[in-house]
Amino acid sequence: VVDAAASSAQLEALDAPARLDWAYRTFGAGLALTTSFGIQSAVLLHMVRELAQRSGVQVPVIWVDTGYLPPETYRYAEQLQELLGFDLRAVQATMSAARMEALHGRLWESGTLEDLELYNRLRKVEPLDRAFQDLGVSCWASGVRGSQTDHRRAMAPLQAVRGLWSLRPLLSWSRKDVFYYMEQHGLPQHPLFEQGYSTVGDWHTSAPDDGTTSGRATRFAGLKQECGIHLPGLMGEGI
């Protein structure tokens, strides 16, 4: 039985690779990694590759392909897969993008939080939860950092979310920590990083930093900073 408070206290003293080692020892085949192939995704993907080399076991990497990612993200995913060779499990919504738009319209254009939450539930949260169930996941690691949003700043290294354990190996990392790790290990940057993006999601809800907004404040037209994957309750917690 995992004690959240005691485990989080133990994890606070560990660096990111050691947190992944702890999770593998604790959850075994129930451990998975989620990735968005965003600006900082290469860091945890590299750490999972290193874990595989130490343990001999491939941790499955779950990628929710919404069907609305920028072309650069799809190409970046191919580049990292070829470079690092992880066990990628790409999942999609049961409802196609065309069907969703026919039934609900272009949900991101209405300017309402309700439509944006419906979009995120259909395209992201439900496919991810289905993948967790299919793979028998009991704990998933993600690249959330405390400095990204107010909600994430209040997170602990390990918390229960929608009946599973959510591990945040990079919770205390800064943008500089991410950049220097990638430089140290020769990891390629996302193509949109050089165009001023500090975070990348779907093409219609991402924008480069413009001097007045930056980070996840550029996402979802400023209506919200979380897609729902990393949130407890009906909308879930996340990628």
Predicted regions and their residues:
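Nucleotide-activated chemistry modules centered on ATP-dependent adenylation/adenylyltransferase
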Residues: 1-239
